[in-house]
Amino acid sequence: MALLEVDNVVVRFGGVTAVDRATFTAEAGDVTGLIGPNGAGKTTLFNVITGLQSPGAGVVRFDGSDITGYTTHQRARLGIARTFQRLEAFGSLSVWDNVLTAAEIHRRWQRDAGDPRHVTADLVERVGIAGFSQQRADSVPTGTARLLELARALAIEPRLLLLDEPSSGLGESETETFGDLLRVLALDGRAVLMVEHDMDLVMRVCDVIHVLDFGQVIATGTPAEIRANPKVMQAYLGTYADVVTSAEQVESEEVEAPRG
């Protein structure tokens, strides 16, 4: 059974259907991509999964239970964490205190959770922001702020981690390291669900990709299957041709790389 199940979800804003009978899953241990053109409904679906948006129809299940009517904090207590496109850190607090605050809140929910200071020290090191620990969150580079958002989400020890454009603002080497970290987070037993426009990152780290267009899931498959899907090519038009070329170059380099 999938950890997350989105089943025939519909969201309408007035006369506009933002999400149209969307159905997909995310498995524990996998990095799952949710991609599509701008306005396809990706962030709206994240809002439905986390309880910020009520669907007009459909069901969201977590670990087999219907959570469609749950509040955001009830879902967080179940182990659902999220980052946002817009940075949401407490700007006047240090990087350290931002993560510590999240860890302390989790300790109140779950008394057997680790010591908040130890958790914070581990997370700032793990995501690569330890050198910025004492800086105010509103003074760090955008890429660092993105990693801070990830550390705060991880502080509640989530079983399902939703990341909305997490590589935005990261440099090339930072993005590569970030992708490796996502694989580790999934291998630890989490389900990682990612909305991302960096197709090189998506194709490299995702086990499964769902493609949205006009609020509908038009394709689901492995990166190789998605690259070859004509519906996806049509949805992306010329942009997707660049994605295919880039992904094929990465694949070719991996094949040609010397083996130790």
What residue spans do the PLM features occupy?
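Glycine-rich phosphate-binding loops of nucleotide-dependent enzymes
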Residues: A2-G260
